Amino acid sequence: LGFTTKNWKGGQSREKWNSNNKPKTPGRLNDLRHIIYKGGDTHWRQAKNNLGLMLKEGLLKENIDGEAISWAYSRLRKRKEERKILMVISDGAPVDDSTLSVNSGDFLEKHLKKIVKYIEEKSEIEILAIGIGHDVSRYYDKAIKITDVNELGDVMISQLSSLFESKKNYH
């Protein structure tokens, strides 16, 4: 799964807020784009063209992480697998200029922390994050930072192996 915003500078969400006389503390002011690169039941061969979308120029814009994590979590909760792991690949902090220009500067960060805390403390789903070039441990209890995107594959395997090994030791 992937996520971004549909527009720079807010799009329809911002226009609607403007036309409603700009009420105070409006919350998110950008249109979301949630992307299913590969569904849980889709074979890798069927998804390979979709995976190439990650590299499409102009697709990725701003990041409203909390709502994206919530969306991914709700999809994962519906799955029938016994064990569920939500691995987040992050390039840093949630940022959306349209939203942050009219809400508190930590609005998106607070929301992300709230969502992650709920998953970590009250959910059967395990969540971990890999920050590319950024330390994301202020958002996620299980987090690792890498400096080079070329490390990503090996670190993903290593982190998953550690999770499986730690779970095995409990039984």
Which residue stretches match the model-derived regions?
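Acidic, glycine-rich A-domain
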Residues: 1-171
